[in-house]
Each structure stands twice: as structure tokens, then as C-alpha cells.
Amino acid sequence: MLQGPDVGRLLLDRLVAEGVRYGRDFALVRITVPLGSAEELAPTFGRVLRDADVLVRWEADELLALLPATDRPGAERAAERLKAAVDGAAVQLGAAHWVGDTAFDLLARAQPRA
């Protein structure tokens, strides 16, 4: 089930807080999809994510895969798996690993690219 943006913001803020307090790694993949296709593509993305990962709607045409306990190479591998799962679909992905920055800065570093 695709979670909404309010849940996404709450979970992202929690991951940042846990990172600050406990030094826990996490990453995210920002996924831009064709407008109106998020619900259709979400189950496919969900099948390639780990059980601990969460897929949320961020904007009308954007999803986030929140990846707890994930380093930079792990985030890049997750992005590759997500892209391969929808081979041929017009999606753009950007991955970023949390390095002590704010959620805003992390999202900016994960700006999707073709």
C-alpha cells in the first residue's frame, strides 16, 4: 500500500532524528513518475524493496523509497533495482545517503535525473 505524503514526512523526520541521536545510517531514493502512474507503479516498486523499506507518495508525480540502515552503495543499488523493475517506463531516480544533513538538504541531493 502506498503511504501518503504526511506519513512520508513523519517517517523521514523520524529517520533524521534517529540518525542524529543514534548515528543510524539511512538513505532514500526519490522517484519521479509520469503524472497519474504512481498507484500503478507502486506495487512493482514495492516488490523490489526490502521489508524494512517504505514507499511513500511525496508529490503527485513523485515517490520516495525510505531505506533505513542503508549506506550510499546500498542506496545506489536500490535505485538500480527500482529502475530495472520498471524497465521502459519514463521514471527518473535520484539516491542520497544521510550524512548528518537536514531532510531538506537530503532531498535536494536526491534530485532525480534521467
Predicted regions and their residues:
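Short regulatory alpha-helical coupling segments
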Residues: L2-R24, P34, E39-R47, A110
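Alpha-helical scaffold within the catalytic cores of cyclic-nucleotide enzymes
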Residues: L12, L41-L49, A75-A90, Q111
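Conserved RecA-like P-loop NTPase ATPase core
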Residues: L15, L63, L82
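A short glycine-enriched loop-to-beta-strand structural element that forms part of the catalytic core
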Residues: A27, R57-P68, G88-R113
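Short, acidic/hydrophobic/Gly-rich beta-strand patch recurrent on exposed beta strands
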Residues: R30-T32
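Catalytic cores and conserved motifs of cyclic dinucleotide signaling enzymes
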Residues: G36-P43, P73-R77, W98-R113
